[in-house]
């Protein structure tokens, strides 16, 4: 399960348990109309103290499909988490996605929001 909320120039995604296909469908249902009307989504903040993983291998594959289908339309992604090894995610993601990806510690959520705002929008 996830909580998804829209802010002026970014979307906040907060996983509340292992990720599922339904979670990615829910995110797409909200951001796809924005992409269709505006051509892009300025930012996505993924906030979770510890990454919850996926319910199944099929859900992991659905996550990869979501990234494949949306990465060109999202300008920035902030991963706000204390998950071990999260700091290497931006370097790895840089090889596969067009978005500018940065990692912030969970307690540095305000810094992630400030980074999103620096792209030109306000909360």
Regions found by a protein language model. Name each.
Residues 1-123:
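Amphipathic, Lys/Arg-enriched alpha-helical "gate/interface" segment within cytosolic domains
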